[in-house]
A protein has these predicted regions:
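Glycine-rich, acidic loop segments that terminate in or are immediately followed by a histidine
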Residues: 3-138
């Protein structure tokens, strides 16, 4: 357990300076982290755990504010939310229908989920996802 906690701490320390920050149309704070470029790969913790740990720290740092964290790689995104009423399965369905050739799949719940897509469509999928999050109720 101690070794795992140390690995998580090292991973989070490595990625935090690279977290991108935005405030969305609905007032939610969006934090994005490229878990392929700025985190250790093929080791513990995996991208979902890394994104979750970063999200939990940001929720503490911005207590009471609506927060969404997206950890992404070349062909996936992991979402965590606090205070933003996202329907991730619905967003996945809409993205799949709206973006031809992106191969969007995935799902989750209202506050946690994951999305897969083809690598060449990453930027298009992420920008459309962010627009949807920006319209979600707080």
């Amino acid at each position: 357990v101690e070794e795992a906690n140390r690995a998580i701490e090292e991973q989070v320390e490595a990625i935090m300076p690279h977290v991108e920050r935005r405030v969305l149309e609905n007032g939610a704070r969006l934090f994005m982290l490229d878990v392929e470029l700025f985190a250790h790969r093929f080791t513990f913790p995996p991208p979902g755990k890394t994104s979750g740990e970063v999200h939990d720290r940001l929720v503490r740092a911005y207590a009471g504010e609506p927060i969404v964290t997206i950890g992404y790689g070349p062909d996936f995104a992991v979402l965590r939310s606090r205070g933003v009423m996202m329907n991730i399965p619905q967003m996945v369905r809409e993205l799949r229908d709206e973006i031809a050739g992106a191969g969007v799949s995935g799902g989750g719940h209202l506050v946690v989920g994951s999305i897969k897509f083809v690598e060449g469509m990453r930027d298009v999928v992420l920008e459309n996802l962010i627009k949807k999050i920006g319209k979600a109720p707080i």
